[in-house]
């Protein structure tokens, strides 16, 4: 599943969003035609399992170089300069402890590796814990399907 840009064009000032228009972002017209499936964006920290290895997302902001060994997720954003990458989670790095905890808490009984895919890390170690969880977890992207309106006014 590929995340699309904002459906309607954003207005920027100094690389910051200051508004939104009723114009459809070029390349997203298919959404208004009824194609595709909308899913809930879970609020946490993006991560992935790639070939059995656990990664967290790293955003090389405009002018910053990604860490050695980072895997690009996509091309750099031409407007903001942000360039997302995957960097391996290091179980020995204290900065990664919440990711390690989330991964381990999400394994099914007897499982040693999560399936390949992208996930959102949620819980007390992520984004202020908006879901009030007592433990960290990773949840697969695209699990909660919704059917919102497909116009600017919803």
Predicted regions and their residues:
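Core nucleotide-handling region used for phosphoryl-transfer chemistry
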Residues: 1-154
């Amino acid at each position: 599943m590929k995340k699309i840009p904002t459906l309607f064009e954003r207005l920027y000032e100094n690389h910051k969003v200051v508004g939104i228009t009723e114009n459809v972002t070029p390349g997203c017209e298919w959404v208004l035609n009824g194609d595709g499936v909308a899913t809930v964006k879970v609020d946490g920290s993006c991560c992935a399992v790639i070939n059995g290895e656990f990664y967290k997302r790293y955003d090389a902001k405009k002018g910053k170089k990604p860490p050695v060994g980072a895997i690009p997720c996509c091309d750099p954003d031409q407007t903001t300069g942000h360039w997302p990458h995957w960097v391996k989670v290091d179980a020995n790095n204290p900065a990664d402890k919440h990711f390690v905890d989330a991964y381990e808490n999400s394994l099914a009984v007897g499982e040693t590796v999560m399936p390949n895919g992208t996930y959102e890390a949620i819980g007390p170690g992520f984004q202020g814990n908006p879901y009030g969880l007592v433990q960290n977890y990773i949840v697969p992207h695209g699990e909660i399907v919704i059917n919102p309106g497909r116009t600017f006014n919803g």
